[in-house]
């Protein structure tokens, strides 16, 4: 019996040793809270708060949280570089007000620079946070000097896992948001964006989003009021989703322009549930023709779906002679490759600027025009609808009238 009792005891010990043992960890290692920093505002537009913000990033940028409280105003008189902010959470609940100095900002690339940063959140949890580019002086100067170089409000180059959400962006001197440099997994959501001039000089070139060389960019639940492209899909962008977006006064959701001086590609774009108000077009593709140093443009797998058109000049437009005259393109036809382009679910009414014309599809005579249209019910104010076409396939899906241009 003693033998069997010892054997049972050994079996229990063996089972106990085989089971995973609990590892002791210090509470700090498991539940260590994020460091939280609140920059000290100078309280005057004559005091640049960027150094104080940089100090907060130095202290809390690595895995911490930086808070700009509701009701606070921070004056930014120089470029805000977010370098050092890795896996950090920047919460803007107050106002970030940039200076209107055309002297300082002339020639600058960015007002907020996000360069090769991974895991960054720039957001407002309450929806009260505002980033103001204070662009009025730039609008006025650019009206008299088109060579004046203006900065982008938020400039993302490279990096990954970047979220911009819940904010109001207003009055950038130039583009609101730019993404390039092979950035990956960038999300813009729940943004209110408006560029408004207080003078007769419009806020020129205030694209809502310029999406360049990047992969997996999402733009959702955004409203944009501006004076240029709502979303510009630039060379090198791949896998872009644009959804639940309302644009007013813009140039629409635009692929391009492509092929100005090099071979350019845009591919895998899905834009759906878009409301386009008082814009030059709801959606379109812009490519340069052949010759004169222009490169080959390739646009693949792009879907424009469920667009509500309200007072736009065109619902859909293809320009294969962008940047050149009609006489030039007669001898140097467009050669862009448009492959698997789907336009479906468009409804609403155009502005009537071009009488009954609701779409203008000028595909290149030497290119590929793999475009299909379905459930397209946009009409002119008169109730009639004409789609102008050139070099489009017989399988297009709508009745064409010759005479397309652009």
From Swiss-Prot:
Keywords of the record: Carbohydrate metabolism, Cell wall biogenesis/degradation, Glycoprotein, Glycosidase, Hydrolase, Polysaccharide degradation, Repeat, Secreted, Signal
Taxonomic superkingdom: Eukaryota
GO molecular function: polygalacturonase activity
Annotated localization: Secreted
EC number(s) stated in the UniProt entry for this protein: 3.2.1.-
SMART domains per record: PbH1
PbH1-type repeats, residues: 183-213, 214-235, 237-257, 299-320
InterPro entries: Glyco_hydro_28, PbH1, Pectin_lyas_fold, Pectin_lyase_fold/virulence
GO CC field: extracellular region
Glycan-modified residues: 244, 301
Keyword Secreted: yes
Active-site positions on this chain: 228, 251
SUPFAM superfamilies in the cross-refs: Pectin lyase-like (SSF51126)
Signal peptide extent: 1-18
The UniProt record lists the keyword Transmembrane: no
PANTHER family for this protein: ENDO-XYLOGALACTURONAN HYDROLASE A-RELATED, PTHR31736
Family: Belongs to the glycosyl hydrolase 28 family.
Biological role: Pectinolytic enzyme involved in the degradation of xylogalacturonan (xga), a galacturonan backbone heavily substituted with xylose, and which is one important component of the hairy regions of pectin. Activity requires a galacturonic acid backbone substituted with xylose.
Protein's recorded name: Probable endo-xylogalacturonan hydrolase A
